[in-house]
Design a protein with these regions (language model features):
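Short beta-strand/loop segment at the start of cytosolic alpha/beta domains
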Residues: 1-16
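General small-molecule cofactor/ligand-binding pocket signal
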Residues: 7, 79, 101
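Conserved catalytic submotifs in the C-terminal HATPase_c
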Residues: 9-10, 49, 81, 105
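Glycine-centered tight turns that cap/initiate beta-strands
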Residues: 11, 94-97, 103
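Amphipathic alpha-helical interaction surfaces in cytosolic regulatory modules
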Residues: 23-98
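A charged, well-structured terminal subsegment
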Residues: 102-112
């Protein structure tokens, strides 16, 4: 299961993820990111404090959102990544690609 909430902070869409982002829940993620409030945002922070697991399909979903943000002259970055999820980010190289920040404030500042 994946719970997704969003709020705008200093012009940046902060998307909080809670649960698992995998082959089953990536459709939920993609559908939410396609909603007008989310899709119109070119600067996105994914708050991963509540994300307990991510699979390769979840990484792909994040990458697609990052590419979309970049095509709109924006960026997507991550924050508050748990040790288990961070390990996947480091091994896959996604941490370096997307950027991982300690907290929401640091992530928002990095892409503002």
């Amino acid at each position: 299961m994946l719970e997704i909430t969003g709020e705008v902070l200093n012009g940046v869409m902060v998307v909080s993820l809670t649960g698992r982002l995998d082959g089953i829940t990536s459709k939920t993620y993609n559908d939410k990111m396609a909603e007008p409030d989310y899709a119109s945002s070119s600067k996105i922070v994914l708050d991963c404090a509540g994300l307990s697991y991510i699979s390769s399909e979840g990484l792909r979903a994040m990458l697609m959102a990052a590419k979309k943000a970049k095509s709109q002259n924006g960026a997507l970055t991550l924050c508050a990544v748990s040790p288990a999820v961070n390990e996947v980010m480091v091994i896959s190289g996604f941490g370096a690609l997307l950027g991982v920040h300690e907290n929401i404030e640091a992530a928002v500042k990095a892409i503002s």
